[in-house]
């Protein structure tokens, strides 16, 4: 199987061009190739496929083999992959995901895609659609107890579910302890991605993320979008802000006119290779 390793802010995936390759049982393949000791090493596997509804289709699998609806960092790399390889010459690309069709706008330098702006669509705030076990109109600054400590949580879906809470110092926050307990909290029937945020100022937010099925990662694009939306709802941020993640910065904007959230950030190719899956 031929592959390309790429990352968006250190959120790294193995990309396979399914116009040329067939991947049987992608869930198992994801587990094998993601292993950082016995495989290639990544946060998951992304398949780039033909689509009947858009220019391309993306399927993505976490390192534990579970299929995810959408990943902002991964989809930016899909945009770079198809443009740099000449699979399209368009600067605006439509990509089908399990969370709907996403529109990508590429900034091209020297014939290569450098920055990708993604229309992430409208945030979902109704608890039943996130899903959260709550009959509230929106789940904003609601108390969630973990280990006897109360967190004020705001929930947003960007095609996948997020629980956002605020902390004084995100660098020393015990994420590896609290993150998995938030992910598996009974309030969240499909588990949840947990973001912990420090507000630097009204246009700068600093976050760490515990991703459902992957643990702490260097960056999560949908998580950064959810953080911006939650921060606007909570009155602590402007509608456009820089979100600082461990792997780097994303610029997130929640447009007032069309209610869409836009994410702009880099996409980087690391290397290409070939792997015999029977040997893993």
Curated annotation (Swiss-Prot):
<dbReference type="Pfam" id="PF01678">
    <property type="entry name" value="DAP_epimerase"/>
</dbReference>
<dbReference type="InterPro" id="IPR018510">
    <property type="entry name" value="DAP_epimerase_AS"/>
</dbReference>
<keyword id="KW-0457">Lysine biosynthesis</keyword>
<comment type="subunit">
    <text>Homodimer.</text>
</comment>
<feature type="binding site">
    <location>
        <position position="62"/>
    </location>
    <ligand>
        <name>substrate</name>
    </ligand>
</feature>
<feature type="binding site">
    <location>
        <begin position="211"/>
        <end position="212"/>
    </location>
    <ligand>
        <name>substrate</name>
    </ligand>
</feature>
<protein>
    <recommendedName>
        <fullName>Diaminopimelate epimerase</fullName>
        <ecNumber>5.1.1.7</ecNumber>
    </recommendedName>
</protein>
<feature type="binding site">
    <location>
        <position position="160"/>
    </location>
    <ligand>
        <name>substrate</name>
    </ligand>
</feature>
<comment type="pathway">
    <text>Amino-acid biosynthesis; L-lysine biosynthesis via DAP pathway; DL-2,6-diaminopimelate from LL-2,6-diaminopimelate: step 1/1.</text>
</comment>
<dbReference type="GO" id="GO:0009089">
    <property type="term" value="P:lysine biosynthetic process via diaminopimelate"/>
</dbReference>
<comment type="similarity">
    <text>Belongs to the diaminopimelate epimerase family.</text>
</comment>
<feature type="active site" description="Proton acceptor">
    <location>
        <position position="220"/>
    </location>
</feature>
<dbReference type="GO" id="GO:0008837">
    <property type="term" value="F:diaminopimelate epimerase activity"/>
</dbReference>
<feature type="binding site">
    <location>
        <begin position="221"/>
        <end position="222"/>
    </location>
    <ligand>
        <name>substrate</name>
    </ligand>
</feature>
<dbReference type="GO" id="GO:0005829">
    <property type="term" value="C:cytosol"/>
</dbReference>
<feature type="site" description="Could be important to modulate the pK values of the two catalytic cysteine residues">
    <location>
        <position position="211"/>
    </location>
</feature>
<feature type="active site" description="Proton donor">
    <location>
        <position position="71"/>
    </location>
</feature>
<keyword id="KW-0963">Cytoplasm</keyword>
<feature type="binding site">
    <location>
        <position position="193"/>
    </location>
    <ligand>
        <name>substrate</name>
    </ligand>
</feature>
<feature type="binding site">
    <location>
        <begin position="72"/>
        <end position="73"/>
    </location>
    <ligand>
        <name>substrate</name>
    </ligand>
</feature>
<keyword id="KW-0413">Isomerase</keyword>
<dbReference type="InterPro" id="IPR001653">
    <property type="entry name" value="DAP_epimerase_DapF"/>
</dbReference>
<keyword id="KW-0028">Amino-acid biosynthesis</keyword>
<feature type="site" description="Could be important to modulate the pK values of the two catalytic cysteine residues">
    <location>
        <position position="162"/>
    </location>
</feature>
<feature type="binding site">
    <location>
        <position position="11"/>
    </location>
    <ligand>
        <name>substrate</name>
    </ligand>
</feature>
<comment type="function">
    <text>Catalyzes the stereoinversion of LL-2,6-diaminopimelate (L,L-DAP) to meso-diaminopimelate (meso-DAP), a precursor of L-lysine and an essential component of the bacterial peptidoglycan.</text>
</comment>
